[in-house]
Amino acid sequence: IDEKKLEAVGEKYGIPPQYRFTDYRDLVNCDIVDAVDICTSNDAHFKVAMAAVEAGKPFNLEKPITLTAEEADILAKAAQEKNVKNMVCFSYRFKAAARYAKDLIAQGKIGRVYHVNMQYFQAWGLPRANCPLVWRYVKSRTGTGALGDLGSHALDLVRFVTNKEYTRVVGHTGTYVHERPLLDGEGVGKVDVDDFSNYMADMEDEISVSFQITRFAYGRGNYQRMEIYGSEGAIVYSLDATPAGIDEIEVCSGDINADAHVFNHLPIPQQYFSDQMQSFADIVNGTGDGLAANIQDGQANQHLLDAIVESAEKGTWLSL
């Protein structure tokens, strides 16, 4: 904790000195704290979340929930045993287009799902962006690079929309920029996590999935595209594909002949719109809609991340 910054922020927002904490445990256990929002670097997720569990306080946890599957198992078990309410920030579950796509698939509108192709592209890792060695490039603090930062979202979104579990994965990861300037400007430091990750997966019901994840996609801010192909139609979910940066959905159905294949943008009914932080408040108050991710979803996701890393190292498929 930078105590000078702590004092400055406290003064700016009128926070009394007794509520300016330098130890997260004191903050979590403070009498006026009703719930805990954990948005630290990844290496602190486990210990802060465990403190919330031990205090019996609801918590909202950023992803990936831990650095390893072992930590995820411990945290998930503890939260379940103490019956502590929680939410994991797989934010794209709250996109109206994703919820609409999920519902269309559940209704059988595109028949049996065969394939899903998922892309998640950003550009801030490119050399010309001049990003220094922030914590997201340091394995001891982040666990993985683009894989955990972006790929965890992609894995969860496909699982959420299809409502199917993964059965095996195979991965490939790589790093383009191996050194970056230190934050203090004094020299450079080693990048020891991935800049990109490509992986394939099989899911229940023989669904075949491919993923392309990178921070080196020139011109992309926070771009996602998920194509879902079924026996009776197809759905395309996209985010940040236009300057408006909104989430959209296109659907193709009807005649099987290729010349009749038209992807139509669908207006999204109001019922699919939701707010992430309101959803956490609803969970705390016992009125959640059941669509937000919980600690068990985060646990499953961490096991997937670990499996993809191991698969990339071994160069082979891994069953889950």
What are these model-predicted stretches?
Residues 156-245, 274-288:
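Contiguous beta-strand/loop segments that form the cofactor/metal-binding neighborhood of enzyme cores
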Residues 1-13:
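NAD(P)-binding Rossmann-fold cofactor-contacting core
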Residues 61, 86-88, 117, 211, ...:
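Hydrophobic residues in well-ordered beta-strands that form the structural core
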Residues 12, 35-38, 73, 81, ...:
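C-terminal helix-rich "cap/oligomerization" subdomain common to oxidoreductases
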Residues 72-91, 111-115:
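Rossmann-fold dehydrogenase core element
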